[in-house]
Amino acid sequence: AESAYQAWKAGAAIVHIHVRDDEGKPSYDIDKYHETIERIRAHKDCDVCINITSSGKENGDDEERIRPIRELLPELASFDCGSLNWQHRSIFENHPRFLEKLGTELKELNVKPEIEIFDAGMVYNAIHYMKTGLLKTPCHFQIVLGAAGGMTNTVENLVYLKSILPEGCTWAGCGIGSGHMPMMLATIALGGHLRVGLEDNVYYHRGVLAESNAQLVARAKRLLEEAGLQAATPDEAREIYGLTRKVF
């Protein structure tokens, strides 16, 4: 919660939330989610948009993946639009049954899906769900490159994935690990929004660990300013993405 608050102070418009258990392992513990979100919302000066993951750890069942979103009503929630061999060691499963459940609940709760894309097939899965009405348009896509099992973090892959996104949708890009900086710069050049943070990359420079999420946010903000752009405020992000602000 404190990391999210400091990231907002550094310029983040949206914070993406995972929780861990007391041993530091990824968790779906609903009490941890409540504690984390309530601590963020307790900062009355903080108007950051909250995005809760639907994929907090491997092998979660449908209900425990959806429950934090249902109970805490974020403005966004991740919607990983397909399955893949994750890190060459397990299956990151997003069964069509689960995606139907998740998409239906997000519509009912008025929570915007953050459609995470790890390869081109996931874009076409999203287009299918747009046609069936499961995903309400205009959609928001998060292109994630460099995860082992997904598309590699090259500019060519980013340009290609951007080219097949449905017209009128918003998008953001990010690179995992060593691709973090190249994909951030390419995303800025292509007119996308940015995602940065320790979930994707723990290094600030080669061999130098990042101090915090806030440090990575501050660098992204500086790069935008060097390009003649400005980081969006939370309210500007709400307008850009078509979010419904939740008041508690």
Residues covered by each model-derived region:
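Short beta-strand segments at enzyme active-site cores
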Residues: 12-21, 49-53, 115-116, 237
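Structured C-terminal cap/extension of enzyme domains
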Residues: 159, 163-164, 185-248
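Active-site beta->alpha loop and helix N-cap motifs at the rims of alpha/beta catalytic domains
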Residues: 24-93
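Catalytic alpha/beta core domains of metabolic enzymes, predominantly
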Residues: 76-199, 210-212
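Glycine-rich, proline-tolerant flexible connector loops at the mouths of alpha/beta enzymes
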Residues: 13-36, 86, 144-145, 202-206
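A structural motif
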Residues: 9-14, 74, 191-192
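Alpha-helix-loop-beta-strand connector modules within alpha/beta enzyme cores
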Residues: 1, 25-52, 100-108, 160-168, ...
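Short, acidic/polar
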Residues: 1-5, 60-70, 180-184
